[in-house]
Swiss-Prot record:
The protein's annotated pathway: Amino-acid biosynthesis; L-methionine biosynthesis via de novo pathway; O-acetyl-L-homoserine from L-homoserine: step 1/1
Entry keyword annotation includes Iron: no
Gene3D superfamilies attached to this UniProt entry: 1.10.1740.110, alpha/beta hydrolase, CBS-domain
Gene it is expressed from: metXA
An example Gene Ontology CC term for this record: cytoplasm
Domain AB hydrolase-1: 47-353
Disulfide links within the chain: none
Top-rank EC class of the record's enzyme: transferase
Function recorded in the entry: Transfers an acetyl group from acetyl-CoA to L-homoserine, forming acetyl-L-homoserine.
Active site positions, chain numbering: S152, D315, H348
Listed name of the protein: Homoserine O-acetyltransferase
EC number per UniProt: 2.3.1.31
Claim: Cell membrane is one of the keywords in the record: no
CBS domain boundaries: 375-432, 436-490
Amino acid sequence: MQRGSVGISTTSTFTLATPLLLESGASLFSVQIAYETYGTLNHDKSNAILVCHALTGDAHAAGHHGDESRPGWWDGVIGPGKAFDTDKYFVICSNVLGGCKGTTGPASQNPDTGKPYGTSFPVVTIRDMVNVQKALIDHLGISQLFAVAGGSMGGMQVLQWMVSYPSMVRKAIAIAATGSSTPQQIAFNEVGRKAITADPAWCGGDYYGKEHPVKGLSLARMVAHITYLSDASMHTKFGRALQDREFRGFDFDTEFQVESYLHHQGTSFTKRFDANSYLYLTKAVDYFDLSVDDSLISGFAPTKATVLIISVTSDWLYPPYQSQEIVSALSANECDVHYCELRSQFGHDAFLIETGQLNYSISRFLDHTLVRDVMNTQVPVISEQSTIAVAARMMITQGVNHLPVLAPDQSLVGIVTSWDIANAVACGYTSLDQIMSSQVITTTGDETIEVAASRMEQHRISALPVIDQAQHVIGLISSDGLSKLIGRGP
Protein backbone atom coordinates (compact mmCIF):
# COMPACT_ATOMS: atom_id res chain seq x y z
CA MET A 1 0.00 0.00 0.00
CA GLN A 2 1.27 3.45 -0.86
CA ARG A 3 2.05 5.55 2.14
CA GLY A 4 0.79 9.10 2.29
CA SER A 5 0.24 12.14 4.47
CA VAL A 6 -2.86 13.04 6.41
CA GLY A 7 -2.53 16.46 4.74
CA ILE A 8 -3.51 19.67 6.48
CA SER A 9 -4.29 19.13 10.16
CA THR A 10 -5.96 21.48 12.61
CA THR A 11 -5.92 21.69 16.39
CA SER A 12 -9.20 21.60 18.32
CA THR A 13 -9.87 22.34 21.98
CA PHE A 14 -12.20 20.95 24.60
CA THR A 15 -12.83 22.38 28.08
CA LEU A 16 -13.72 20.22 31.08
CA ALA A 17 -17.09 21.15 32.54
CA THR A 18 -16.16 19.97 36.04
CA PRO A 19 -13.12 20.60 38.26
CA LEU A 20 -10.17 18.25 37.79
CA LEU A 21 -9.00 16.65 41.03
CA LEU A 22 -5.25 16.04 40.89
CA GLU A 23 -3.22 13.30 42.51
CA SER A 24 -1.75 15.92 44.86
CA GLY A 25 -5.23 16.74 46.19
CA ALA A 26 -5.35 20.12 44.44
CA SER A 27 -8.02 20.98 41.87
CA LEU A 28 -7.94 22.76 38.54
CA PHE A 29 -10.95 24.51 37.04
CA SER A 30 -11.93 24.99 33.38
CA VAL A 31 -9.11 22.77 32.12
CA GLN A 32 -8.66 23.14 28.37
CA ILE A 33 -7.34 20.27 26.23
CA ALA A 34 -5.76 20.83 22.81
CA TYR A 35 -5.99 17.85 20.46
CA GLU A 36 -5.83 16.74 16.84
CA THR A 37 -7.48 13.80 15.09
CA TYR A 38 -6.65 11.97 11.88
CA GLY A 39 -8.79 9.48 9.98
CA THR A 40 -12.46 8.65 10.53
CA LEU A 41 -14.14 7.16 13.58
CA ASN A 42 -16.18 4.14 12.49
CA HIS A 43 -19.84 3.63 13.34
CA ASP A 44 -19.31 1.54 16.46
CA LYS A 45 -16.30 3.66 17.52
CA SER A 46 -14.01 0.65 17.74
CA ASN A 47 -11.06 1.93 15.68
CA ALA A 48 -9.75 4.78 17.87
CA ILE A 49 -6.04 4.96 18.70
CA LEU A 50 -4.66 7.45 21.22
CA VAL A 51 -1.09 8.60 20.56
CA CYS A 52 0.75 10.13 23.55
CA HIS A 53 3.60 12.60 23.05
CA ALA A 54 6.95 12.82 24.81
CA LEU A 55 8.27 15.51 27.17
CA THR A 56 8.46 18.43 24.74
CA GLY A 57 5.94 17.25 22.14
CA ASP A 58 2.43 18.48 21.42
CA ALA A 59 -0.87 17.50 19.85
CA HIS A 60 0.49 18.04 16.32
CA ALA A 61 1.54 14.45 15.61
CA ALA A 62 0.94 14.26 11.86
CA GLY A 63 0.28 16.34 8.76
CA HIS A 64 0.97 20.03 8.33
CA HIS A 65 -0.42 23.24 9.76
CA GLY A 66 -1.19 25.56 6.88
CA ASP A 67 2.00 26.61 5.12
CA GLU A 68 4.37 25.08 7.68
CA SER A 69 6.97 22.88 6.04
CA ARG A 70 7.67 20.85 9.19
CA PRO A 71 5.27 17.91 9.62
CA GLY A 72 3.92 16.58 12.90
CA TRP A 73 6.38 14.91 15.26
CA TRP A 74 5.31 11.32 14.36
CA ASP A 75 4.29 11.93 10.76
CA GLY A 76 6.45 9.01 9.63
CA VAL A 77 4.14 6.46 11.26
CA ILE A 78 0.72 8.18 11.10
CA GLY A 79 -1.14 8.34 7.79
CA PRO A 80 -2.49 6.21 4.94
CA GLY A 81 -0.53 2.97 4.63
CA LYS A 82 1.63 3.67 7.68
CA ALA A 83 1.67 1.88 11.04
CA PHE A 84 -1.19 3.99 12.37
CA ASP A 85 -3.07 3.72 9.10
CA THR A 86 -5.63 6.52 8.91
CA ASP A 87 -7.54 4.55 6.27
CA LYS A 88 -8.27 2.07 9.09
CA TYR A 89 -7.88 3.95 12.36
CA PHE A 90 -9.07 7.15 13.98
CA VAL A 91 -5.93 8.58 15.57
CA ILE A 92 -6.09 11.08 18.44
CA CYS A 93 -3.24 13.07 19.98
CA SER A 94 -3.61 15.66 22.74
CA ASN A 95 -1.21 18.05 24.44
CA VAL A 96 -0.56 16.92 28.01
CA LEU A 97 -1.74 18.67 31.15
CA GLY A 98 1.00 21.08 32.23
CA GLY A 99 2.15 21.59 28.65
CA CYS A 100 2.34 24.84 26.73
CA LYS A 101 0.75 23.96 23.39
CA GLY A 102 -2.93 24.59 24.04
CA THR A 103 -3.66 22.44 27.08
CA THR A 104 -3.86 24.12 30.48
CA GLY A 105 -0.43 24.61 32.02
CA PRO A 106 1.61 27.14 34.03
CA ALA A 107 1.53 29.67 31.18
CA SER A 108 -2.29 29.52 31.06
CA GLN A 109 -4.48 32.15 32.66
CA ASN A 110 -5.52 31.43 36.23
CA PRO A 111 -9.30 32.06 36.30
CA ASP A 112 -9.00 33.33 39.89
CA THR A 113 -6.42 36.04 39.12
CA GLY A 114 -6.69 36.68 35.40
CA LYS A 115 -2.91 36.25 35.20
CA PRO A 116 -0.72 33.30 34.15
CA TYR A 117 -0.45 30.61 36.82
CA GLY A 118 3.34 30.51 36.89
CA THR A 119 4.47 28.42 39.85
CA SER A 120 1.05 28.72 41.50
CA PHE A 121 0.08 25.98 39.04
CA PRO A 122 -0.18 22.73 41.01
CA VAL A 123 2.33 19.95 40.42
CA VAL A 124 0.88 17.32 38.09
CA THR A 125 1.66 13.65 37.48
CA ILE A 126 1.51 11.22 34.59
CA ARG A 127 -1.69 9.87 36.15
CA ASP A 128 -3.20 13.37 36.05
CA MET A 129 -2.28 13.64 32.36
CA VAL A 130 -3.99 10.33 31.63
CA ASN A 131 -7.10 11.36 33.55
CA VAL A 132 -7.38 14.43 31.33
CA GLN A 133 -6.96 12.26 28.23
CA LYS A 134 -9.70 9.98 29.58
CA ALA A 135 -12.02 13.00 29.82
CA LEU A 136 -11.26 13.83 26.18
CA ILE A 137 -11.96 10.25 25.07
CA ASP A 138 -15.27 10.34 26.95
CA HIS A 139 -16.09 13.64 25.24
CA LEU A 140 -15.51 12.01 21.85
CA GLY A 141 -18.00 9.28 22.78
CA ILE A 142 -15.43 6.47 22.73
CA SER A 143 -15.91 3.76 25.35
CA GLN A 144 -12.85 1.70 24.49
CA LEU A 145 -9.61 2.47 22.65
CA PHE A 146 -8.35 0.05 20.03
CA ALA A 147 -4.82 1.05 21.06
CA VAL A 148 -2.77 3.54 23.06
CA ALA A 149 0.78 4.24 21.88
CA GLY A 150 3.69 6.51 22.69
CA GLY A 151 7.42 6.81 23.29
CA SER A 152 9.48 8.11 26.22
CA MET A 153 7.13 10.14 28.45
CA GLY A 154 4.43 9.12 25.98
CA GLY A 155 5.25 5.50 26.77
CA MET A 156 4.79 6.25 30.46
CA GLN A 157 1.31 7.54 29.69
CA VAL A 158 0.60 4.30 27.82
CA LEU A 159 1.65 2.24 30.84
CA GLN A 160 -0.47 4.44 33.11
CA TRP A 161 -3.49 3.91 30.84
CA MET A 162 -2.98 0.15 31.14
CA VAL A 163 -3.32 0.20 34.93
CA SER A 164 -5.65 3.18 35.45
CA TYR A 165 -8.23 2.21 32.82
CA PRO A 166 -7.54 -1.45 31.98
CA SER A 167 -10.96 -2.12 30.46
CA MET A 168 -10.64 0.82 28.06
CA VAL A 169 -7.40 -0.33 26.38
CA ARG A 170 -7.39 -3.22 23.93
CA LYS A 171 -3.79 -2.85 22.73
CA ALA A 172 -0.90 -0.87 24.16
CA ILE A 173 2.44 0.12 22.62
CA ALA A 174 5.08 1.59 24.93
CA ILE A 175 8.39 2.58 23.35
CA ALA A 176 11.66 3.53 25.09
CA ALA A 177 9.97 3.88 28.46
CA THR A 178 10.25 2.67 32.03
CA GLY A 179 7.86 1.48 34.70
CA SER A 180 9.60 3.59 37.33
CA SER A 181 11.92 6.57 36.83
CA THR A 182 15.46 5.78 37.95
CA PRO A 183 17.87 7.92 40.00
CA GLN A 184 19.91 8.69 36.88
CA GLN A 185 16.84 9.92 35.00
CA ILE A 186 15.78 12.04 37.98
CA ALA A 187 19.31 13.44 38.24
CA PHE A 188 19.40 14.68 34.65
CA ASN A 189 15.99 16.29 35.08
CA GLU A 190 17.12 18.04 38.25
CA VAL A 191 20.15 19.54 36.48
CA GLY A 192 17.81 20.90 33.81
CA ARG A 193 15.46 22.39 36.38
CA LYS A 194 18.31 24.03 38.27
CA ALA A 195 19.59 25.56 35.05
CA ILE A 196 16.20 27.25 34.64
CA THR A 197 15.65 28.36 38.23
CA ALA A 198 19.22 29.73 38.46
CA ASP A 199 18.54 32.07 35.54
CA PRO A 200 17.84 35.54 37.06
CA ALA A 201 15.10 36.03 34.46
CA TRP A 202 13.11 33.13 35.92
CA CYS A 203 11.91 35.39 38.77
CA GLY A 204 10.38 32.55 40.73
CA GLY A 205 8.32 31.61 37.68
CA ASP A 206 6.72 35.05 37.35
CA TYR A 207 8.36 36.10 34.08
CA TYR A 208 5.34 36.34 31.77
CA GLY A 209 5.17 39.69 30.02
CA LYS A 210 8.87 40.18 30.76
CA GLU A 211 12.17 38.66 29.72
CA HIS A 212 11.94 34.87 29.76
CA PRO A 213 14.66 32.64 31.27
CA VAL A 214 15.95 31.63 27.85
CA LYS A 215 19.54 31.05 29.00
CA GLY A 216 18.47 28.57 31.65
CA LEU A 217 15.95 26.83 29.39
CA SER A 218 18.52 26.60 26.59
CA LEU A 219 21.05 25.00 28.93
CA ALA A 220 18.43 22.55 30.22
CA ARG A 221 17.68 21.51 26.65
CA MET A 222 21.36 21.10 25.83
CA VAL A 223 21.87 18.75 28.76
CA ALA A 224 18.74 16.77 27.95
CA HIS A 225 19.60 16.50 24.28
CA ILE A 226 22.87 14.77 25.09
CA THR A 227 20.86 12.03 26.80
CA TYR A 228 18.68 11.62 23.71
CA LEU A 229 21.69 10.78 21.52
CA SER A 230 24.27 8.02 21.79
CA ASP A 231 28.05 7.87 21.76
CA ALA A 232 27.97 6.16 18.37
CA SER A 233 25.57 8.66 16.81
CA MET A 234 27.67 11.61 18.01
CA HIS A 235 30.82 10.01 16.60
CA THR A 236 29.07 9.48 13.27
CA LYS A 237 27.41 12.90 13.10
CA PHE A 238 30.20 15.09 14.49
CA GLY A 239 33.39 13.23 15.30
CA ARG A 240 35.91 15.80 16.47
CA ALA A 241 35.24 18.13 13.55
CA LEU A 242 35.54 21.88 14.12
CA GLN A 243 32.75 24.30 13.22
CA ASP A 244 33.53 27.02 10.64
CA ARG A 245 37.27 26.92 11.30
CA GLU A 246 40.32 24.86 10.41
CA PHE A 247 42.37 25.26 13.58
CA ARG A 248 41.82 25.34 17.32
CA GLY A 249 41.46 28.84 18.75
CA PHE A 250 42.87 28.10 22.20
CA ASP A 251 40.01 30.01 23.79
CA PHE A 252 36.53 29.30 25.15
CA ASP A 253 34.51 30.07 22.03
CA THR A 254 32.32 27.39 20.47
CA GLU A 255 34.73 25.36 18.34
CA PHE A 256 33.52 21.80 17.84
CA GLN A 257 30.56 20.89 15.64
CA VAL A 258 28.93 19.04 18.53
CA GLU A 259 29.09 22.23 20.62
CA SER A 260 27.50 24.26 17.84
CA TYR A 261 24.78 21.64 17.43
CA LEU A 262 23.89 21.70 21.13
CA HIS A 263 23.77 25.50 21.17
CA HIS A 264 21.44 25.44 18.16
CA GLN A 265 19.19 22.88 19.85
CA GLY A 266 19.04 24.98 23.01
CA THR A 267 18.36 28.28 21.27
CA SER A 268 15.68 26.93 18.94
CA PHE A 269 13.95 25.17 21.84
CA THR A 270 13.45 28.43 23.74
CA LYS A 271 11.39 29.76 20.83
CA ARG A 272 8.77 27.03 21.11
CA PHE A 273 8.63 25.95 24.76
CA ASP A 274 7.82 27.46 28.13
CA ALA A 275 10.40 27.17 30.92
CA ASN A 276 7.81 26.59 33.65
CA SER A 277 6.22 23.79 31.64
CA TYR A 278 9.65 22.19 31.45
CA LEU A 279 9.87 22.28 35.24
CA TYR A 280 6.44 20.73 35.71
CA LEU A 281 6.73 18.02 33.07
CA THR A 282 10.16 16.83 34.20
CA LYS A 283 8.84 16.66 37.77
CA ALA A 284 5.91 14.54 36.53
CA VAL A 285 8.41 12.18 34.90
CA ASP A 286 10.43 11.99 38.14
CA TYR A 287 7.31 11.05 40.13
CA PHE A 288 6.37 8.28 37.69
CA ASP A 289 6.46 4.92 39.47
CA LEU A 290 3.96 2.17 38.73
CA SER A 291 5.40 -0.25 41.26
CA VAL A 292 3.28 -1.23 44.26
CA ASP A 293 5.28 -2.08 47.39
CA ASP A 294 8.41 -1.88 45.20
CA SER A 295 6.97 -4.48 42.83
CA LEU A 296 6.23 -3.83 39.15
CA ILE A 297 4.48 -7.19 39.08
CA SER A 298 1.94 -5.88 41.58
CA GLY A 299 1.77 -2.55 39.78
CA PHE A 300 0.83 -4.11 36.44
CA ALA A 301 -1.70 -6.54 37.94
CA PRO A 302 -4.78 -4.65 36.60
CA THR A 303 -3.56 -4.84 32.97
CA LYS A 304 -5.92 -6.45 30.46
CA ALA A 305 -4.50 -5.13 27.18
CA THR A 306 -2.40 -6.96 24.65
CA VAL A 307 0.94 -5.17 24.96
CA LEU A 308 3.91 -4.41 22.72
CA ILE A 309 7.04 -3.15 24.47
CA ILE A 310 9.76 -1.67 22.25
CA SER A 311 13.24 -0.61 23.36
CA VAL A 312 16.22 0.91 21.52
CA THR A 313 19.54 -0.94 21.53
CA SER A 314 21.62 2.25 21.94
CA ASP A 315 19.30 4.04 24.39
CA TRP A 316 21.25 4.79 27.58
CA LEU A 317 18.59 7.10 29.06
CA TYR A 318 15.89 4.39 29.05
CA PRO A 319 18.02 1.31 28.34
CA PRO A 320 16.56 -1.99 27.10
CA TYR A 321 16.78 -3.66 30.51
CA GLN A 322 14.08 -1.29 31.79
CA SER A 323 11.73 -2.34 28.98
CA GLN A 324 12.58 -5.97 29.73
CA GLU A 325 11.61 -5.42 33.37
CA ILE A 326 8.18 -4.27 32.16
CA VAL A 327 7.88 -7.38 29.97
CA SER A 328 8.81 -9.63 32.90
CA ALA A 329 6.25 -7.95 35.17
CA LEU A 330 3.50 -8.28 32.57
CA SER A 331 4.44 -11.90 31.88
CA ALA A 332 4.25 -12.64 35.60
CA ASN A 333 0.65 -11.38 35.43
CA GLU A 334 0.00 -13.72 32.47
CA CYS A 335 -0.58 -10.75 30.17
CA ASP A 336 -0.30 -11.13 26.40
CA VAL A 337 2.94 -9.18 25.95
CA HIS A 338 5.31 -8.89 22.99
CA TYR A 339 8.80 -7.39 22.91
CA CYS A 340 11.14 -6.11 20.22
CA GLU A 341 14.15 -3.81 19.92
CA LEU A 342 14.87 -1.04 17.46
CA ARG A 343 18.39 -1.76 16.27
CA SER A 344 19.68 1.77 15.98
CA GLN A 345 22.66 3.97 16.78
CA PHE A 346 20.44 7.03 17.30
CA GLY A 347 19.92 6.47 21.03
CA HIS A 348 16.71 7.44 22.80
CA ASP A 349 15.54 9.59 19.88
CA ALA A 350 15.30 6.50 17.68
CA PHE A 351 11.60 6.25 18.53
CA LEU A 352 11.17 9.45 16.48
CA ILE A 353 13.69 8.60 13.76
CA GLU A 354 13.55 4.88 12.95
CA THR A 355 10.20 5.04 11.16
CA GLY A 356 10.98 2.06 8.94
CA GLN A 357 11.43 -0.34 11.84
CA LEU A 358 8.51 1.22 13.71
CA ASN A 359 6.14 0.89 10.76
CA TYR A 360 7.06 -2.78 10.42
CA SER A 361 6.82 -3.73 14.11
CA ILE A 362 3.73 -1.70 14.96
CA SER A 363 1.84 -2.72 11.81
CA ARG A 364 2.43 -6.41 12.52
CA PHE A 365 1.24 -5.94 16.09
CA LEU A 366 -1.90 -3.99 15.18
CA ASP A 367 -2.80 -6.14 12.18
CA HIS A 368 -2.74 -9.37 14.18
CA THR A 369 -6.11 -8.59 15.66
CA LEU A 370 -8.45 -11.08 17.27
CA VAL A 371 -12.20 -10.77 17.66
CA ARG A 372 -11.80 -10.23 21.40
CA ASP A 373 -9.65 -7.17 20.65
CA VAL A 374 -12.47 -5.35 18.86
CA MET A 375 -15.77 -6.84 19.99
CA ASN A 376 -18.38 -4.77 21.78
CA THR A 377 -18.74 -6.25 25.25
CA GLN A 378 -21.74 -4.10 26.24
CA VAL A 379 -24.30 -6.15 24.32
CA PRO A 380 -28.04 -5.86 25.01
CA VAL A 381 -29.67 -9.31 25.07
CA ILE A 382 -33.25 -10.54 25.37
CA SER A 383 -34.81 -13.70 26.77
CA GLU A 384 -36.68 -16.11 24.52
CA GLN A 385 -39.83 -15.51 26.60
CA SER A 386 -39.90 -11.82 25.65
CA THR A 387 -42.36 -10.32 23.20
CA ILE A 388 -41.72 -8.62 19.88
CA ALA A 389 -42.84 -5.33 21.43
CA VAL A 390 -40.18 -5.63 24.14
CA ALA A 391 -37.54 -6.41 21.51
CA ALA A 392 -38.58 -3.40 19.43
CA ARG A 393 -38.44 -1.06 22.41
CA MET A 394 -35.02 -2.38 23.42
CA MET A 395 -33.63 -1.81 19.93
CA ILE A 396 -34.88 1.77 19.96
CA THR A 397 -33.67 2.63 23.46
CA GLN A 398 -30.29 0.89 23.06
CA GLY A 399 -29.73 2.07 19.49
CA VAL A 400 -28.91 -1.42 18.18
CA ASN A 401 -29.95 -3.51 15.19
CA HIS A 402 -29.17 -6.98 16.61
CA LEU A 403 -30.44 -8.66 19.78
CA PRO A 404 -29.06 -12.06 20.82
CA VAL A 405 -31.83 -14.23 22.30
CA LEU A 406 -30.96 -16.24 25.42
CA ALA A 407 -32.38 -19.38 27.01
CA PRO A 408 -33.01 -19.53 30.78
CA ASP A 409 -29.47 -20.94 31.27
CA GLN A 410 -28.13 -17.83 29.46
CA SER A 411 -26.99 -19.82 26.42
CA LEU A 412 -27.55 -18.40 22.94
CA VAL A 413 -30.64 -19.78 21.19
CA GLY A 414 -31.32 -17.17 18.52
CA ILE A 415 -30.91 -13.64 17.22
CA VAL A 416 -33.39 -10.93 16.26
CA THR A 417 -32.58 -8.08 13.87
CA SER A 418 -34.32 -4.81 13.09
CA TRP A 419 -35.33 -6.35 9.74
CA ASP A 420 -37.07 -9.16 11.68
CA ILE A 421 -39.02 -6.56 13.68
CA ALA A 422 -40.12 -4.81 10.48
CA ASN A 423 -41.15 -8.17 9.03
CA ALA A 424 -43.17 -8.95 12.18
CA VAL A 425 -45.10 -5.69 11.82
CA ALA A 426 -45.76 -6.36 8.14
CA CYS A 427 -46.94 -9.95 8.72
CA GLY A 428 -48.71 -9.43 12.04
CA TYR A 429 -46.47 -11.74 14.08
CA THR A 430 -46.60 -11.43 17.87
CA SER A 431 -44.31 -14.16 19.18
CA LEU A 432 -40.53 -13.80 19.24
CA ASP A 433 -39.94 -17.39 18.11
CA GLN A 434 -41.86 -16.57 14.92
CA ILE A 435 -39.21 -14.13 13.76
CA MET A 436 -35.90 -14.96 15.41
CA SER A 437 -33.16 -16.85 13.58
CA SER A 438 -32.41 -20.02 15.54
CA GLN A 439 -29.47 -21.11 13.37
CA VAL A 440 -27.16 -18.38 14.61
CA ILE A 441 -23.83 -17.81 12.90
CA THR A 442 -21.30 -16.99 15.63
CA THR A 443 -17.62 -16.39 16.27
CA THR A 444 -15.26 -16.77 19.22
CA GLY A 445 -12.90 -14.31 20.82
CA ASP A 446 -9.83 -16.20 19.59
CA GLU A 447 -10.69 -16.01 15.90
CA THR A 448 -9.00 -13.37 13.76
CA ILE A 449 -11.05 -10.47 12.48
CA GLU A 450 -10.34 -11.58 8.90
CA VAL A 451 -12.00 -14.96 9.54
CA ALA A 452 -14.98 -13.27 11.21
CA ALA A 453 -15.36 -10.78 8.36
CA SER A 454 -15.20 -13.56 5.79
CA ARG A 455 -17.91 -15.48 7.64
CA MET A 456 -20.21 -12.45 7.64
CA GLU A 457 -19.57 -11.92 3.94
CA GLN A 458 -20.21 -15.59 3.15
CA HIS A 459 -23.54 -15.63 5.00
CA ARG A 460 -24.50 -12.08 4.01
CA ILE A 461 -25.03 -10.94 7.58
CA SER A 462 -23.94 -7.75 9.30
CA ALA A 463 -23.08 -8.92 12.83
CA LEU A 464 -21.83 -11.93 14.74
CA PRO A 465 -22.46 -12.77 18.39
CA VAL A 466 -19.24 -13.74 20.15
CA ILE A 467 -19.67 -16.80 22.37
CA ASP A 468 -17.58 -18.74 24.89
CA GLN A 469 -17.38 -22.52 25.34
CA ALA A 470 -20.64 -22.55 27.30
CA GLN A 471 -22.46 -20.82 24.42
CA HIS A 472 -22.79 -17.67 26.52
CA VAL A 473 -22.68 -14.35 24.68
CA ILE A 474 -19.56 -12.38 25.62
CA GLY A 475 -19.69 -9.76 22.88
CA LEU A 476 -20.79 -8.78 19.40
CA ILE A 477 -18.96 -7.54 16.31
CA SER A 478 -20.42 -5.70 13.33
CA SER A 479 -19.38 -5.66 9.68
CA ASP A 480 -19.04 -1.87 9.81
CA GLY A 481 -16.31 -1.97 12.43
CA LEU A 482 -14.45 -4.92 10.91
CA SER A 483 -14.50 -3.58 7.36
CA LYS A 484 -12.69 -0.45 8.47
CA LEU A 485 -10.06 -2.39 10.39
CA ILE A 486 -9.23 -4.84 7.58
CA GLY A 487 -9.24 -2.18 4.90
CA ARG A 488 -12.48 -3.08 3.11
CA GLY A 489 -14.42 -0.06 4.26
CA PRO A 490 -14.69 3.36 2.60
